[in-house]
Amino acid sequence: PFFGLGGGVPITPFGDWSFDLSEDQARVLLEDCPDHAVLVTHSPPRDACDLDAGGTPLGSLAIREAVVRRKPRLVICGHVHASWTRRARIGDSMVVNAGPQGVLLTVSPDGEVG
């Protein structure tokens, strides 16, 4: 299964045009994510594909907690421009910041992502 969460998490300082969620709002919505799903989010999880140009992590704690708890096979995110096309792992979960360029992933018949 696939599960998605849109919007910037945590709330960003970009003004009224930005659709954002608080960490608490994201936690509630992520409760419905099935175990071992493919998780598609706008924001990355904290400490995975989330560093800005200055090296500051901008990712979401709520998304990271959901990854640790639900163990998705794959997490596809974007949002943090300086980390586009980066890959990382949280446990057995592959995290990919696809950015606007996209990324090519290989999924084996047994569900392994590389």
Where are these regions (language model features)?
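Conserved catalytic scaffold of divalent metal-dependent phosphoesterases
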Residues: P1-L58, A62
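Generic alpha-helix signal with a bias toward terminal, lower-confidence helices
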Residues: F14-W17, A53, H79, D92, ...
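Binuclear metal-dependent phosphoesterase catalytic core
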Residues: G8, R64-L74, A82-G114
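Histidine-centered catalytic micro-motifs
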Residues: V40-P45, R73-S83
